Amino acid sequence: MATFGAPATANSNPNKSYEVTPSPADSISSLSFSPRADILVATSWDNQVRCWEISRSGASLASAPKASISHDQPVLCSAWKDDGTTVFSGGCDKQAKMWPLLSGGQPVTVAMHEGPIAAMAWIPGMNLLATGSWDKTLKYWDTRQQNPVHTQQLPDKCYTLSVKHPLMVVGTADRNLIVFNLQNPQTEFKRIQSPLKYQTRCVTAFPDQQGFLVGSIEGRVGVHHLDDSQQSKNFTFKCHRDGNDIYSVNSLNFHPVHGTFATAGSDGAFNFWDKDSKQRLKAMSRCNQPIPCSSFNHDGSIYAYAACYDWSKGAENHNPATAKSSIFLHLPQESEVKAKPRVGATGRK
């Protein structure tokens, strides 16, 4: 309990989530679950890519550290091959590594850019790796070849990308959203100005490939449909705000079974939403640090999220003595993530 006159100490784990150990030594930049098993990969600013095996017995969770690899500089992003055998990672050393995790093989460099690699995705239908960089290019890689299959010029630095074959959405600086139909990957399908007024932080494609979500630094999410006849279904909503304090939306994840989605933000909270009934299903308690990244496991029974300093307030506000980086696992209740009709309303914009 707080002493009278002294501020209460914010809780680092107010949702009583399971903590994965050991924690990375520096801020966590991405979390990716295997599409086939409960194996979690984290990338971090201490140049590391780490892997844990997660096991569950009823409501109890356990984690076992399995392996790790190093980059030469901070690692920013990660992706899994669709068969769950291989992890890809990229970052400030301007290269992407392929790590044959399940076979115990050594990592090899499979992609190079002229600037940091900010985002990546494996494209299952094409057996290609897509990498997006601050060098204003998107590259497609056949991992057996030294040179990219194709280099696509982007209008600005790549910040984020998402693939749900055949749909790919790329978010760049200056609020550009570039949509690709991967059946014709060398041509832009559509270029859209973000429906949000501020810098794009994250995008994720709809599971049915009919559109995408976009999150911005101004505590807002846009729900966007690609078909011109569906534009009336587009809307934006505010989230990750506390009075006049507005926080970045850092991560968007669709639930693999229910089609609802999670947002995570720099306010330290994660929430579950239903875009079709336009309602929040569950608001979780705020951690005392930002949540920069998150991931559902393959069946949506586990939601992983990181809590750590996100550098949004600069180096001068970073206190290494108190800024612990943590990875937590939350077990979503069905009521938190299952879609439900909005009672007595037609939907709120």
UniProtKB/Swiss-Prot annotation:
Organism name: Arabidopsis thaliana
Subunit structure of this chain's protein = Part of the nuclear pore complex (NPC). The NPC has an eight-fold symmetrical structure comprising a central transport channel and two rings, the cytoplasmic and nuclear rings, to which eight filaments are attached. The cytoplasmic filaments have loose ends, while the nuclear filaments are joined in a distal ring, forming a nuclear basket. NPCs are highly dynamic in configuration and composition, and can be devided in 3 subcomplexes, the NUP62 subcomplex, the NUP107-160 subcomplex and the NUP93 subcomplex, containing approximately 30 different nucleoporin proteins. Interacts with DDB1A.
A family per Pfam: WD40
Where's it found, cell-wise? Nucleus envelope; Nucleus, Nuclear pore complex
Similarity remark: Belongs to the WD repeat rae1 family.
* Primary localisation category: nucleus
Task: Spell out the residue ranges making up region: Disordered.
Answer: 1-21
Motif DWD box per record, residues? 128-144
Q: What PANTHER family does UniProt report for this protein, alphabetically?
A: MRNA EXPORT FACTOR AND BUB3
The UniProt keywords, alphabetically, are: Acetylation, mRNA transport, Nuclear pore complex, Nucleus, Protein transport, Repeat, Translocation, Transport, WD repeat
- Compositional bias annotation for Polar residues: 9-21
* Name of the featured protein: Protein RAE1
Name a GO CC annotation attached to this entry: Cul4-RING E3 ubiquitin ligase complex
Which of the residues bear the PTM N-acetylalanine?
A2
Repeat (WD) positions are 23-62, 70-109, 112-151, 153-190, 244-283
Read off the domain note: The DWD box is required for interaction with DDB1A.
InterPro entries recorded for this chain? Answer: G-protein_beta_WD-40_rep, WD40/YVTN_repeat-like_dom_sf, WD40_repeat_dom_sf, WD40_rpt
User: From its record, what is one biological process in GO terms?
Assistant: mRNA transport
